[in-house]
């Protein structure tokens, strides 16, 4: 007879004989929430917190899906939408959207300058327009200034902005000439010009009144020879350009004496050009009116003024042949225009016959490149002269005060 097992062994055998429960697969967090809800094993506050955490996790995993309602966060609107509204302290405040266009058009600087009465020369000097570079060595950056200018028009006469030679009673836009112009124009050199005899003088006065011509003009003249050996020079062509190199005046001139040497190989002028040339008196009057009250630029200007038959105030002349900064380029007392063009501007001129328009443009370029030096030298020269005269009481109140202290 087998021994009887204790009660503890009997319990153990029953547990071993009983079927073992199978392990269930892990359920998801969402299924656990549902099971907990059905069994009411968690509170409503905990459920709400878990739901918000689950929603945030889903939003993080899918950023393209936007939440339906978010009171705690503010959304930014693009500038094209309507102004947003935000409640602060019970008041509704509008936030206007600002839209800025990076490509907004600014008013023209030249239009503004015209309204303020500022000349184009002063504008170009202030903004360093035109010439670039500070070295005196040759530079190709100066070449486009000449190449981009329109070609010279020989014997075109007066070519002011708005002037048309085919319509002497009106300008290019059909506007009538002003009727309040004086009948005569007295120049500083003593010449008295009758403005009723030529339309050019009336147009020049009109351009001066409207500040069309500007402050600076550059001149160059071509001469031919008269006398037994052709040594005496007389005027045969005169050209004038403005501060920007634009042609203002160009005319062939009928010589006042019999020509014995046309100097065609240099001047480019021959007898055939005289068929359409203007009289010396007409050219002299027009040029004198153009230069009145303006600063004259040129190379060795003394010879140009001699053949024109009038003078110009010395303090209003900027001569590239006499500028101290250019003396180092000359092999004598003064350098030639051809040497200055090559050494200072890096361009070649006078390869053949001369062009007075080109020479006037080169002289203006030389002046513009060293304008500050020209102005300083001119100011020092004539201020010193005034100071010496001021020693006798001509210096104004300062001279009188010194006299009283002695």
From Swiss-Prot:
It comes from the Eukaryota. GO terms for molecular function: 3'-5' exonuclease activity; exonuclease activity; nucleic acid binding. It is an enzyme of class 3 (hydrolase). Residues 377-387 have a biased composition (Basic and acidic residues). Residues 216-367 form the Exonuclease domain. Keywords: Exonuclease, Hydrolase, Nuclease, Nucleus, rRNA processing. It is found in: Nucleus. One of its GO terms (cellular component) is nucleus. InterPro entries: Exonuclease_RNaseT/DNA_pol3, REX4_DEDDh_dom, REXO1/3/4-like, RNaseH-like_sf, RNaseH_sf. Pfam families: RNase_T. Residues 1-10, 162-173 have a biased composition (Polar residues). PANTHER family: RNA EXONUCLEASE 4, RNA EXONUCLEASE REXO1 / RECO3 FAMILY MEMBER-RELATED. Exoribonuclease involved in ribosome biosynthesis. Involved in the processing of ITS1, the internal transcribed spacer localized between the 18S and 5.8S rRNAs. Belongs to the REXO4 family. This is RNA exonuclease 4. It comes from Neurospora crassa (strain ATCC 24698 / 74-OR23-1A / CBS 708.71 / DSM 1257 / FGSC 987). The gene is rex-4.
């Amino acid at each position: 007879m087998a021994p009887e097992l204790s009660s503890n062994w009997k319990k153990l055998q029953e547990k071993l004989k009983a079927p073992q429960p199978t392990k269930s697969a892990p359920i998801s967090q969402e299924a656990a929430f549902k099971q907990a809800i059905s069994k009411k094993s968690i509170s409503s506050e905990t459920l709400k917190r878990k739901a918000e955490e689950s929603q945030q996790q889903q939003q993080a995993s899918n950023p393209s899906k936007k939440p339906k309602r978010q009171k705690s966060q503010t959304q930014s609107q693009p500038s094209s939408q309507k102004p947003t509204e935000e409640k602060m302290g019970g008041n509704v405040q509008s936030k206007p959207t600002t839209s800025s266009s990076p490509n907004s058009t600014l008013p023209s600087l030249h239009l503004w300058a015209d309204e303020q009465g500022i000349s184009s020369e002063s504008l170009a000097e202030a903004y360093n327009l035109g010439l670039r570079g500070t070295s005196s060595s040759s530079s190709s950056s100066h070449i486009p200034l000449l190449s981009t200018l329109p070609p010279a028009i020989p014997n075109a006469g007066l070519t002011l902005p708005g002037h048309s030679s085919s319509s002497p009673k009106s300008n290019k836009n059909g506007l009538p000439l002003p009727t309040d112009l004086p009948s005569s124009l007295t120049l500083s050199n003593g010449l008295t010009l009758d403005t009723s005899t030529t339309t050019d003088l009336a147009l020049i006065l009109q351009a001066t009144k409207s500040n069309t011509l500007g402050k600076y003009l550059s001149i160059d003249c071509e001469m031919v020879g008269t006398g037994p050996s052709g040594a005496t020079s007389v005027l045969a062509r005169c050209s004038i350009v403005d501060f920007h190199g634009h042609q203002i005046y160009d005319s062939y001139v009928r010589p006042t004496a019999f020509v014995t040497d046309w100097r065609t190989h240099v001047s480019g002028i021959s007898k055939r050009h005289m068929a359409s040339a203007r009289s010396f008196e007409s050219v002299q009057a027009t040029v004198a009116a153009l230069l009145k009250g303006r600063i004259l630029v040129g190379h060795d200007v003394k010879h140009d003024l001699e053949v024109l038959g009038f003078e110009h105030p010395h303090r209003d002349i900027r001569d590239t042949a006499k500028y101290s900064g250019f003396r180092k380029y000359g092999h004598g007392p003064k350098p030639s225009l051809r040497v200055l063009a090559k050494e200072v501007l890096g361009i070649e001129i006078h390869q053949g016959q001369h062009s007075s328009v080109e020479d006037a443009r080169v002289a203006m370029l030389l002046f513009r490149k060293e304008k500050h030096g020209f102005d300083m030298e001119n100011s020092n020269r004539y201020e010193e002269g005034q100071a010496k005269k001021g020693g006798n009481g001509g210096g104004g109140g300062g001279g009188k005060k010194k006299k009283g202290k002695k």
